Structures are given as structure tokens and as C-alpha cells.
């Protein structure tokens, strides 16, 4: 942790004596003394006499410049000179200078690493935001030409593929991104497809995953409903496409079928697979569900209950978190599997990567969605989150050698087993979540000013910034400038030579290990997500600069001329071998977060919206 004073007590110890209160008489006398010492010609008696004449001459001119009828008492009975000039006017204190800032506070006020502040209207960032919009248009054009209605695009083969149940996942995932970007032509195309085809697809399709369908399709529909003006008097980002009620009705139909995952289970833990056309559900082949998956559908079901007026969606989804509250944990940390049959955790594997990640994300986001401190019924979620983050710092955070990168590892065999210095790119959601949990969506400066940050919040915010650096260095260390799916870190107990990222100039080339099986890049959003949140909260433009660097690498190595972007097999080689798949989250998350990172803070403000784990913004509940 930083050796500097905690942010909340820095001002107590910082010397601000220069600006203590001084009386008007003292100000006046000191002004004369200062004037006399700064003018060499005033050192003689004649000079002093001339200065006095000049001073009183100016005063007389000021007095006589007003009308005589303004003399006497003013409306409040205070004595004035002729012309209405108060006695205090001549003895007025000079303008008060801004308080001198401590070095740390000075860094807080300056948003960039060189101390300059770059506004959201800066043409450089406006141009970069436009570049992201053009990238989204290019990605969509490839999908529209070769894969419209399929879940995903294979941009090199120029065809579509259904890997998520055949619900046109890319269409729904991309819809609210197009709304936010103001791309009305794409909103119209995607919205028309949703209105014409999606309801029929839902009624006819077979097995889908509860989690993936909820976060991508249900979440996308709900966000589109809100952003298109579904809740009157709130936001309306588009005037094209279907009426908002169309999105809502399709969302309800889909959610009604997904509810079978909850109602079919003998415990509050839902099954993971749903047969849509039958409205039935069953457990996974191994029997267990993923902890992250069953605990990362609550934002969507809560919001659907709010706008539909039917509590059944929220009731079923929230039973999961209430149940997990009762289960034994390891310093707030939980295994990555849970059984729908018994309701208990399965195994001891603890990690914040795959199958564990969004459990922790939704603890704090569901609490925020429900009004945070305004709703005491959900306080237990905040308590669980705080306990879990303490556990992360105590059990999972270590430093690499030789350069000391902060990373989050894993406990494959529980807290009594051996620590693994393995960190999925998925873990890079954590810096953003930590920052959001610390300030509750406010800027760091505002939260400090209002004295809203606890010591725990400050610890989490510091960890967020340290981890964000590590996540960015996972990009910097490779030959392509794009991160691998998984990285390992050199520690005093773990070392493996010859598996660097290919960028020998990186100062962290000896800290980060990239194994051959982990060198692929799937166009994932987690790092740019955290850069976006941290920029919004800290106003430090290094996060924008880093985001732009990542975007340029995507443009250079993953763009397909005929349309779309593709995953890579190996980020440590140039040119990299391409994998021929554009994940839906590249349009739904990665490009959305980059666009927002370079844009105005008033668009989807973090104190009024929470993003689901697929980057679909949903409004925070407000007490009326």
C-alpha cells in the first residue's frame, strides 16, 4: 500500500497557515509596506510624499464620481462615504487566493499525468471517440453482410455461427451501443430485426444457458427499453426503431421461460440450462452450476420486475443471493461451483476469474441498483462485498518479482492449499468494480469533498489503481500490444523462464509469464471497462491514453477488411495468427466502453446507472 497519508486525513496535517484570517487594518498596512519595499524610488522622502498624494487623489476621484444623493446611511443603516462607498471598501481585503493544495491533492485536481486538464470537449478525444464509432460501424457492417440473425460472425470465413442458442445475440448485444453512439441506421436495422424475428426465435429454440442468455439478450432488451424512452421523463437516446414496449414485451416472454431454471430447482440455486420452447430447465451434465452464473442475473430480473410491475422475477433471482449469504465462506470468498440439488458449494477452488468473477461484481452493483443506503433490505449485499474484498487483499493479492506488479491469484485447493500466481484477463473487471464500490459512482474528488470515503474505500481504490496498471501491462508486454487470455506472474515461490510476451522493451517482461495455451485474445472488454470507470472516477487521463493504445492495437491486428474484427491465436507473435471469430461482447462491451471512455461524463453517469456484466446500462433505483 502507499506510504502517503490516507486521503481522508491529508488536509489535517498539511500546513495551510499562509491563508489564515487577517484583519482589514493589517491587510491595509501590509499592503503599504509591501508597496514601499518593492519600489526603489519610494525609498526617499519625496517619493513617499508623492505616493501619498497619488493614493488620496485616487480616493477623492472615486468619492466624487457618485451622485451626492447617495450619501448618508444605506438601506441597512451602515455608514458610508459620499457616493455610497463604504469605509470598508478602502480597507477591503485583497481577493482571496485559492487555498494551497498538498502535493497529493494537487494531483487529484489535475486530471492528466503531466498536470494538465483535458476537457471532454477536447477535439483530440472527440476525434478518437469518432474512430471508435467508425470501428463499431465496420464491425456491424461485417455482421450484417455475412451473419445477420446468427449469434456471431466468423469474419474471415464470412459466415455466421450460432453458439449461444440461436437468438441473434450480436444483434441484441450491439443494440444499446448503437443507441449510445447515435448510429440511428444501425438502431433501426437491429431494432427491426428484434421486432420481426426475436419473439419467434425464443418460442422455437431449444437449450440455452441461463446466465449467457440473461446478460446478453435479456440485458440488451432491457437496456434498449430504457434508452429508447421506455420510462417516461427519463432518458431517450433514440427516436428510431420499435416502440419501447416492444422490447419490454419480448423481455417478459424470454424471462418467463428463463424462470423455469429457478422454479424447477429443489433449492434457491437455479439450474444452468433452459429449454426455451418447453419452458423447462435441467442441471448441467456434472450437476453443479457456476457460482458466478447463478449470482449474476439479479440486476436484470430486478429491473424487469420494476418496469413490469410483476415482482416474480426479482423474487426468484434474489433468493439466490439471500441463500448464499447463509453459506460458509473463506473470508468472504466462495468456491466457483454450487449445487442446485443441495444448495451447497462444490469443491474448494477460489478465484476471481472464470466462474467466480461476476459473483463479486453483482454484490456491489445490485446493492447500488436498489438505492444503496436508501434501502436497508439489501445492506447484507454491501456487507458481503466488503468482507470479500478484505479476503481478496488478504488471501489473493501478491506482488510479482522483480518489478512488483500487484496481481490477484487463485486458490485452486482452498485457503489451506497452494497459491497459484495465475490471473485471467477476466479478473481485470476488478479494478473498475473496486473503484465503483469505493465512490458509489461519484468522482474521487467529490467523494473526498463530501467525506464519503471510509478507510476501506480508500484501500479498495488504491488496489483498483494498482491492478489497473497490471492489467494494462499485460497488453504492453506482448508483441502485438494485446493481452493474453491468461497470465502467470513470477514470485519468490514461482518462476518459469522463456515464456515472455514478445516485447523485450517492456520493463515487466520478466514479471509476466504467458504460457503457449494462454496466448489467445478474444477481443475481451474487462481492461477497457476498468479504464473507463477509473477515468470517470479519478479524472486521470492516463486511463484514456491507455485505452487509446489498446484500441490502436485492435485496429492494427484484429480488423478484417471485408468487415468485422477477429480474435487472435497468439498475441506474442507478429503477425499474429487469426482465430476467425468476433465475439458478441466486442460490440456490446469493448467498443462501448472505449466510446464512453473518450466521451462526455454526462452520458450514462455512474451515479445513475449500473452496467450489467455484459455492459448493458440499467438505471439505479431512486426513491420518489
From Swiss-Prot:
Disruption phenotype: Formation of aberrant N-glycan structures. Pathway: Protein modification; protein glycosylation. Expressed in flowers, siliques, stems, leaves, roots, stamens and sepals. Residues 91-123 are annotated as: Disordered. Keywords: Calcium, Disulfide bond, Glycoprotein, Golgi apparatus, Hydrolase, Magnesium, Manganese, Membrane, Metal-binding, Signal-anchor, Transmembrane, Transmembrane helix. It is a single-pass type II membrane protein. The keyword Manganese applies. Ca(2+) or Mn(2+). Mg(2+) can be used to a lesser extent. Its main location: Golgi. InterPro entries: 6hp_glycosidase-like_sf, Glyco_hydro_47, Glycosyl_Hydrolase_47, Seven-hairpin_glycosidases. This is Mannosyl-oligosaccharide 1,2-alpha-mannosidase MNS3. It comes from Arabidopsis thaliana (Mouse-ear cress).
Amino acid at each position: 500500500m502507499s506510504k502517503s497519508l490516507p486521503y481522508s486525513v491529508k488536509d489535517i496535517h498539511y500546513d495551510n497557515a499562509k491563508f489564515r484570517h487577517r484583519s482589514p487594518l493589517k491587510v491595509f498596512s501590509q499592503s503599504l509596506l509591501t508597496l514601499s519595499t518593492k519600489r526603489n524610488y519610494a525609498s526617499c522622502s519625496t517619493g513617499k510624499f508623492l505616493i501619498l498624494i497619488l493614493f488620496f487623489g485616487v480616493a477623492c476621484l472615486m468619492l466624487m464620481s457618485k451622485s451626492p444623493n447617495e450619501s448618508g446611511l444605506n438601506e441597512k443603516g451602515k455608514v458610508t462615504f459620499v457616493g455610497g462607498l463604504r469605509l470598508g471598501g478602502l480597507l477591503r481585503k485583497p481577493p482571496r487566493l485559492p487555498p494551497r493544495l498538498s502535493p497529493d491533492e494537487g494531483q487529484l485536481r489535475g486530471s492528466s499525468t503531466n498536470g494538465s486538464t483535458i476537457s471532454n470537449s477536447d477535439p483530440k478525444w472527440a476525434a478518437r471517440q469518432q474512430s471508435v464509432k467508425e470501428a463499431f460501424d465496420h464491425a456491424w457492417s461485417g455482421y450484417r453482410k455475412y451473419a445477420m440473425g446468427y449469434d456471431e460472425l466468423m469474419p474471415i470465413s464470412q459466415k455466421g455461427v450460432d453458439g449461444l442458442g440461436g437468438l441473434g445475440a450480436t444483434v441484441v448485444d450491439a443494440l444499446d451501443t448503437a443507441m449510445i453512439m447515435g448510429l440511428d441506421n444501425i438502431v433501426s436495422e437491429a431494432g427491426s430485426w428484434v421486432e420481426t424475428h426475436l419473439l419467434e426465435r425464443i418460442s422455437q429454440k431449444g437449450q440455452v444457458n441461463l446466465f449467457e442468455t440473461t446478460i446478453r439478450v435479456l440485458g440488451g432488451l432491457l437496456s434498449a427499453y430504457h434508452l429508447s424512452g421506455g420510462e417516461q421523463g427519463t432518458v431517450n437516446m433514440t427516436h428510431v426503431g420499435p416502440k419501447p414496449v416492444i422490447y419490454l414485451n419480448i423481455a417478459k416472454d424470454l424471462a418467463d421461460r428463463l424462470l423455469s431454471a429457478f422454479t424447477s430447482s429443489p433449492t434457491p440455486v437455479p439450474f444452468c440450462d433452459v429449454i426455451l420452447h418447453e419452458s423447462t430447465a435441467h442441471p448441467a451434465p456434472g450437476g453443479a452450476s457456476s457460482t458466478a452464473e447463478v449470482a449474476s442475473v439479479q440486476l436484470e430480473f430486478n429491473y424487469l420486475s420494476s418496469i413490469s410491475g410483476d415482482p416474480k422475477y426479482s423474487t426468484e433471482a434474489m433468493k439466490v443471493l439471500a441463500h448464499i449469504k447463509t453459506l460458509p465462506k473463506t473470508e468472504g470468498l466462495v468456491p466457483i461451483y454450487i449445487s442446485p440439488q443441495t444448495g451447497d458449494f462444490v469443491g474448494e477452488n477460489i478465484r476471481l476469474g472464470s466462474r467466480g468473477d461476476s459473483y463479486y461484481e453483482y454484490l456491489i452493483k445490485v446493492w447500488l441498483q436498489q438505492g444503496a443506503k436508501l434501502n436497508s433490505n439489501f445492506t447484507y449485499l454491501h456487507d458481503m462485498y466488503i468482507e470479500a474484498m478484505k479476503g481478496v487483499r488478504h488471501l489473493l493479492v501478491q506482488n510479482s518479482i522483480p518489478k512488483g506488479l500487484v496481481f490477484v491469484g487463485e486458490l485452486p485447493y482452498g485457503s489451506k492449499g497452494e497459491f497459484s500466481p495465475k490471473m485471467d484477463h477476466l479478473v481485470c473487471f476488478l479494478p473498475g468494480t473496486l473503484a465503483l464500490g469505493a465512490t458509489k459512482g461519484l468522482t474521487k474528488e467529490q467523494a473526498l469533498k463530501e467525506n464519503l470515503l471510509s478507510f476501506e474505500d480508500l484501500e479498495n481504490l488504491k488496489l483498483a489503481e494498482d491492478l489497473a496498471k497490471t492489467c494494462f501491462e499485460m497488453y504492453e508486454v506482448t508483441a502485438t500490444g494485446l493481452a493474453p487470455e491468461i497470465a502467470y506472474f513470477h514470485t519468490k515461490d514461482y518462476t518459469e523462464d522463456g515464456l515472455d510476451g514478445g516485447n523485450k522493451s517492456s520493463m515487466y517482461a520478466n514479471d509476466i509469464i504467458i504460457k503457449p495455451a494462454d496466448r489467445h485474445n478474444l477481443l475481451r472488454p474487462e481492461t477497457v471497462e476498468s479504464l473507463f470507470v477509473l477515468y470517470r472516477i479519478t479524472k486521470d487521463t492516463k486511463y484514456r491514453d491507455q485505452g487509446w493504445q489498446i484500441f490502436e492495437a485492435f485496429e492494427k491486428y484484429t480488423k478484417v477488411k471485408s468487415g468485422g474484427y477477429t480474435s487472435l491465436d497468439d498475441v506474442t507473435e507478429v503477425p499474429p495468427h487469426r482465430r476467425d471469430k468476433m465475439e458478441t461482447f466486442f460490440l456490446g462491451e469493448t467498443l462501448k466502453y472505449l466510446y464512453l471512455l473518450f466521451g462526455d461524463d454526462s452520458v450514462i453517469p455512474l451515479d445513475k446507472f449500473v452496467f450489467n456484466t455484459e455492459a448493458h446500462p440499467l438505471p439505479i433505483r431512486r426513491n420518489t
